[in-house]
A protein has these predicted regions:
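SH3/SH3-like beta-barrel superfamily modules
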Residues: 53-89
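Intrinsically disordered, low-complexity segments enriched in proline/serine/threonine
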Residues: 9, 90-91
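Sec-dependent bacterial lipoprotein signal peptides
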Residues: 1-18
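Basic side chains
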Residues: 2, 38-40, 74
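SH3-family beta-barrel domains
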Residues: 18-43, 51-55, 62-65, 69, ...
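A short beta-loop-beta micro-motif enriched in histidine and acidic residues
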Residues: 46
Length: 95
């Protein structure tokens, strides 16, 4: 039971932290000056890329899910709210 409780608590803490920010503003950070963060059709690397987002792109978090040990957030672009997709939470910074 002890081995199960600690990873579960850690995962719930990560997800709760992101879900608590649903509707919160964030910016893309850490993609690098010559790279783009991929906005995907679903939460994982197997989903198609909708578009690339440079560092500094403003987004609104909608929700977050864990997929294969990676936290993914469903976001919309602040300047174009109709554009919605998933990005790795590792590349989002609170605004």
């Amino acid at each position: 039971m002890r081995h199960f409780a600690i990873p579960t608590l850690f995962t719930l803490t990560l997800v709760a932290g992101c879900v608590g920010e649903a509707g919160g503003k964030a910016v893309v950070a850490g993609a690098g000056p010559d790279d783009l963060l991929k906005l995907r059709a679903g939460p994982g690397l197997g989903y198609s890329v909708i578009m690339g987002l440079p560092d500094g792109t403003a987004v609104t978090r909608r929700s977050c899910v864990t997929e294969v040990g990676q936290l993914w957030c469903r976001v919309s672009l602040t300047t174009s709210p109709g554009i919605v997709g998933y990005v790795s939470a590792d590349y989002l910074s609170a605004r």
